[in-house]
């Protein structure tokens, strides 16, 4: 079966357009990772860039440094998991062959 080079180029252009659209959608994703009953909230976008970190002030005196570090790590990991879930839900079916 011969492959028509023009059809191949059309498909590649369409594939590139799909990738560009997905990148745009990913940049618009915003999620919040939370830890310690919302003591710490990390806002992250679909490009895994942290936009904001919030720590409830009233909990500073009650937390030791190790507990605070653990909650910050947990909030970041929660945000990363949520971004991955959003990306997966937005890209399922839009990429050929399950890529």
From Swiss-Prot:
<comment type="similarity">
    <text>Belongs to the YbaB/EbfC family.</text>
</comment>
<comment type="function">
    <text>Binds to DNA and alters its conformation. May be involved in regulation of gene expression, nucleoid organization and DNA protection.</text>
</comment>
<dbReference type="InterPro" id="IPR004401">
    <property type="entry name" value="YbaB/EbfC"/>
</dbReference>
<keyword id="KW-0963">Cytoplasm</keyword>
<keyword id="KW-0238">DNA-binding</keyword>
<dbReference type="InterPro" id="IPR036894">
    <property type="entry name" value="YbaB-like_sf"/>
</dbReference>
<dbReference type="GO" id="GO:0005737">
    <property type="term" value="C:cytoplasm"/>
</dbReference>
<dbReference type="GO" id="GO:0003677">
    <property type="term" value="F:DNA binding"/>
</dbReference>
<dbReference type="GO" id="GO:0043590">
    <property type="term" value="C:bacterial nucleoid"/>
</dbReference>
<dbReference type="Pfam" id="PF02575">
    <property type="entry name" value="YbaB_DNA_bd"/>
</dbReference>
<protein>
    <recommendedName>
        <fullName>Nucleoid-associated protein EbfC</fullName>
    </recommendedName>
</protein>
<comment type="subunit">
    <text>Homodimer.</text>
</comment>
């Amino acid at each position: 079966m011969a492959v028509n080079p023009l059809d191949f180029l059309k498909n590649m252009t369409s594939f590139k357009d799909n990738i560009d659209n997905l990148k745009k959608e990913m940049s618009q994703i915003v999620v919040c990772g939370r830890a310690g009953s919302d003591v710490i909230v990390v806002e992250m976008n679909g490009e895994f860039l942290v936009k904001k970190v919030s720590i409830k002030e009233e909990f500073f005196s009650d937390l030791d440094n190790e507990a605070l570090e653990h909650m910050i790590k947990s909030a970041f990991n929660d945000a990363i998991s949520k971004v991955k879930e959003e990306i997966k839900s937005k890209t399922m079916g839009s990429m050929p062959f399950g890529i």
